[in-house]
Swiss-Prot record:
Keywords from the UniProt entry: Ribonucleoprotein, Ribosomal protein
NCBIfam families: L27
GO molecular function: structural constituent of ribosome
Pfam families (UniProt xref): Ribosomal_L27
GO CC, one annotated term: cytosolic large ribosomal subunit
Biological processes annotated in GO: translation
Organism: Pseudomonas fluorescens (strain Pf0-1)
SUPFAM superfamilies: Ribosomal L27 protein-like
Protein name: Large ribosomal subunit protein bL27
PANTHER family, A to Z: LARGE RIBOSOMAL SUBUNIT PROTEIN BL27M, RIBOSOMAL PROTEIN L27
Coiled coil: none
Annotated family: Belongs to the bacterial ribosomal protein bL27 family.
Gene name in the database record: rpmA
InterPro entries assigned: Ribosomal_bL27, Ribosomal_bL27_CS
Length: 85
């Protein structure tokens, strides 16, 4: 009898779609108001002057200018600011 018993199914075989997080615009670049600077989970980067934060912690420019990344404070927090050009 050349028969083969059916194999069981696996519980693996799934993978989530990439979320495309990260820094979208870098220091020294000119940016327009409303453009996204960083997409992140939590506050890896904090909003400085001229930068707003969305409900998913996305940082975006509130004014037109040049992006500036800086580390400030006793905790070494990373801030993103937009300096008017």
């Amino acid at each position: 009898m050349a028969h083969k018993k059916a194999g069981g199914s696996t519980r693996n075989g799934r993978d989530s779609e990439a979320k495309r997080l990260g820094v979208k615009m870098y220091g020294g670049q000119v940016i327009k108001a409303g453009n996204i600077i960083v997409r992140q989970r939590g506050t890896q980067f904090h909003a400085g002057y001229g930068v707003g934060m969305g409900k998913d912690h996305t940082l975006f420019a509130k004014i037109e200018g040049v992006i500036k990344f800086e580390v400030k404070g006793a905790f070494g927090r990373r801030y993103v600011s937009v300096v008017a050009a």
